[in-house]
Amino acid sequence: MRSVYPHDQVFGEYCTVNDYVDCPPDELYEYMADTRSLEEWTYSLRGFTPTDEPGLWLAHDRLGSETKIYTRTIANEQARTVDYHCAWDQGKHLWMIYLMRVIDAQVVLDKPGSVVLWTNCHHPFYDENPYPESAPPQRPVWVGDFWDMFGAGHLLELKTLKAIAEYRHRNGLPVTPKWMR
C-alpha cells in the first residue's frame, strides 16, 4: 500500500465520471443529444456552427488558442446513449470519443431523475498529434497534454450539466432551450 499513487495507476487507459441529476432521463437525453448543448455545459467549447457535411459541427476549443474542434453526435434514444465523436483541427477522423449514457434513476436508485455515466478512453493520438499539418503553428499545447486533468475537468463539466438541467427542470423550463429547437 502507498500513500500516493501515480495518475496512470489510478486512471490508466480510461477516465470515467458520473453523477445523479434531478431531471427526467428522457428530457436530459434529448438535451444532451443536441451537439449544441456542449456550448452550455462544457468548459471550453464555443461557437458551434454546422459544416457542409450533415451532422458535423465546427466549434472553437478555448483550451488551445485558435483551435477548431469538429464534433458529430451519435445518439441512441432507446438506450439513451450520447457519444460525442470529436477531433481537434480536422473533421475527417473523429478519434476523441466521449461516451455518455443517461440512466433512469428510478431503476438504479429507486428515485426520480437520471444517472449520467461518462467515459473517455486514452486513444493513442492523445500522446501525439496525428495531423500536425492541420494544427495552428503557434498553438503551444496538444489536447493530450491535458489527459491527467480529464477526470477533474470532466467532473466540473458534469456538475455544470447537472446544475443547468436541475435548474431548468425545477423551475418548469424546458431542459432543451427554445434556441436549440
Regions found by a protein language model. Give the residues of each.
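Hydrophobic ligand-binding cavity/cleft-lining segments
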Residues: M1-E53
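Amphipathic alpha-helical segments that line or abut small-molecule/effector binding pockets
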Residues: D26-Y29, L155, K159
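Beta-strand/loop substructures that line and gate deep hydrophobic ligand-binding cavities in soluble
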Residues: D89-L156, A163, G172
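Glycine-rich portal/gate segments that line the openings of hydrophobic small-molecule binding cavities
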Residues: E39-Y43, T49-I97, L109-D110, V116, ...
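Charge-rich (especially acidic), low-complexity segments
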Residues: N171-R181
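Short loop segments at secondary-structure junctions
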Residues: C23-P25, E77, A105-V108
